[in-house]
């Protein structure tokens, strides 16, 4: 072959390889909301991840504080306008860090929610055991639960815990809250529904103030609600779905009124198998104002206005996903724009769970099967929705899913074998998983630093304003027991995700709360002023997010949602001060009225959240 011919041939090969590489890169970097280009792929490859020693920073490679230059502005994807492409920040390799926050929370944290404004978390468990590790305060009378035998309960079963100091305030509860549900009203009042025995028809109210007490209405609900799910509607009212022997749903009336009307649910009837596997269903408010309801392995879209089923989704194969199968779920972050498209995408994530008969095999045969290892995702507003699954690094049942303020998802707690229930799980799963929704399929999971405390049945995890995650609970015993395989757990931990790496400290914005509104209206354009020690802060590097506090129990994070707001402009207003012009969600379909934590995020690193109310 002549030299000129060989040279021409080599040049042709180089051009061809470059073209193919470019095409592959474009596919890999595509916004993977729909994943249509990834259909037919084999099960995602598991990453082999080395987790650093999380007990201290000594011995770690010294990392200089990062000064990140913003990339050039992108045109943005999707049909919305005024959002742009959010630049991917630096890859965060720090595995996170655990700290022991409290040695004794007083009550085991079966249920948890962050109360707005006062920055205290409400923990409560069950009253049926008539025991906890903290007494009612002086001046609060003991509860007489058996007048004939003069039996009284002087223990507290509800506590308010200061998330910064760990100070505990015990509160009195009289109705049984065991396996109940909850959510926040527009003004931040906690409404707790259902429970056990005399508490099953109860609605309880706890306002968000330092000296507030529980107010209980034992006949507020039409059906007995035990293991039910409560969801917030676009107008700020509530629906309660399901529960043991309650194959129906109802709407909560204003405080002090008793509901009498029930609506039958064919979904719950059709998914009620011999092991149940449809308790604590997943209920997510879709971006169109309708409700996505998932029970066992099936799901529907329900109109809360007409009470008609609008759509049935494909079945999710592989096993059971609701109690006692107990997967965990999230409505993935909702991306908004200055001008939003007519249909705003919404993806639901369901991760882990158990085999259909796992409960029976664990309880009757003492065989603890491996939990499910898959994580499935569904675009519920797609014309042809299809579950798209990938494999987690480890099996997991009874996990908790937490949306982080930067839009990433933390999957934490649970076990590798068995199911929910008393003593029915083995091999606690100590290592959290970080799920990055916008990464390509097969690259979304990263295993983080493990805890040393088992968090199995009756555990919780919730996001905090400082970006940490509060982790507590774990009681697989029928009562408070401490000399067993998995003792009743009273220790509370905090987990710092990778974005709290000390090396990223100078990338963390600080919201100037005196220059940021405390209340906004739907569709309002408003300013968020931040301090940030970075140069050339561009719109493509910044997000403003709103995170709704979730009511968390039994692997269900009720009403958890994060909105990525449309950003109109970002400008420097002197020195390290920057002003972000953001647009509030357009309606209660996207963000039900009430309190949210407002975060500014720079290259994946969030500020401390500030409370904001949307009305």
UniProtKB/Swiss-Prot annotation:
Alphabetic keyword roster: Developmental protein, Glycoprotein, Oxidoreductase, Secreted, Signal
Signal peptide stretch: 1-25
Subcellular location: Secreted
Biased composition (Basic residues): 72-82
Catalyzed reaction equations: an aldehyde + O2 + H2O = a carboxylate + H2O2 + H(+)
Top-level lineage group: Eukaryota
Class of enzymatic activity (EC top level): oxidoreductase
Disordered: annotated span: 70-89
Example of a GO MF term: aldehyde oxidase activity
Main location: secreted
Glycosylation sites: 35, 187, 297
InterPro entries, alphabetized: Gal_Oxase/kelch_b-propeller, Gal_Oxidase_central_sf, Glyoxal_oxidase_N, GO-like_E_set, Ig-like_fold, Ig_E-set
Family matches, as Gene3D superfamilies: Galactose oxidase/kelch, beta-propeller (2.130.10.80), Immunoglobulins (2.60.40.10)
Enzyme Commission number(s) of this protein: 1.2.3.1
The keyword Ribonucleoprotein is annotated on this UniProt entry: no
Keyword Iron-sulfur: no
GO cellular component, one term: extracellular region
Chain's role: Catalyzes the oxidation of aldehydes to the corresponding carboxylate by coupling the reaction to the reduction of dioxygen to hydrogen peroxide. Substrates include glyoxal and other aldehydes. May be regulated by the transcription factor MYB80 during anther development and play a role in tapetum and pollen development.
Protein name: Aldehyde oxidase GLOX1
